[in-house]
């Protein structure tokens, strides 16, 4: 089953996602959190694929993705990807958690009528400047790091990035 929530970012304090476990993890010299950047997108997506399959393995409704299936979907994301709203968490340099968010592309699809046309580049540039909503596509934490505060930290990082970027 899938559930969808809406979160208005105006007035939301991402610090409420930080508790004792998160503070302890943040203070660790081994822990880092970094945005998923375009220049290292493919490397980050390899880690993301691994984290997705590992973190959802115990879910009886989850069907693991092959690397080719995940790569196909990830390559489609690159066109609209915003590095300010997605991140990888690492412990000792090893990826342990991820949050992947994408801007809402519906305004772009509506403006272009879902067709590639002469005006599409103009609509795309307009879309890049006026993104207001984002969707959390998925978040996951490697099984051996679950219940240690990683999820709260990655969510805080993504939501803070959305707020700074002007998402509502």
Question: What is each stretch, according to the model?
Answer:
Residues 1-35:
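Acyl-donor-binding surface of acyltransferase catalytic domains
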Residues 1, 152, 163-166:
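Conserved active-site alpha-helix within GNAT-family acetyltransferase domains
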Residues 6-9, 141-146:
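Conserved beta-strand-loop-alpha-helix junction that forms the acyl-donor binding cleft
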Residues 35-141, 156:
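A conserved beta-strand-loop-helix scaffold within acyl/acetyltransferase catalytic domains
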Residues 17-25, 120-126, 158:
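Intrinsically disordered, low-complexity boundary segments flanking structured domains
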Residues 133-134, 162-168:
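Conserved GNAT acetyl-CoA-binding A-motif
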Residues 145-157:
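Conserved acetyl-CoA pyrophosphate-binding loop and the N-cap/start of the following alpha-helix
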């Amino acid at each position: 089953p899938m559930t969808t929530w809406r979160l208005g970012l105006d007035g939301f304090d991402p610090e409420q996602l930080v508790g004792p476990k998160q503070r302890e993890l943040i203070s660790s010299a081994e822990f880092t959190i970094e945005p998923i950047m375009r220049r290292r997108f493919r490397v980050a997506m390899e880690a993301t694929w691994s984290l997705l399959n590992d973190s959802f393995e115990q879910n009886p409704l989850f069907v693991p993705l092959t690397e080719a299936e995940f790569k196909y979907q990830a390559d489609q994301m690159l066109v609209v990807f915003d590095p300010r709203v997605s991140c990888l968490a690492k412990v000792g340099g090893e990826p342990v958690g991820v949050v992947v968010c994408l801007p809402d592309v519906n305004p772009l699809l509506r403006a272009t009528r879902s067709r590639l046309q002469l005006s599409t580049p103009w609509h795309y540039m307009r879309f890049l400047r006026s993104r207001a909503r984002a969707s959390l596509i998925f978040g996951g934490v490697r099984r051996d790091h679950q219940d240690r505060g990683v999820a709260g930290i990655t969510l805080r990082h993504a939501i803070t990035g959305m707020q700074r970027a002007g998402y509502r």
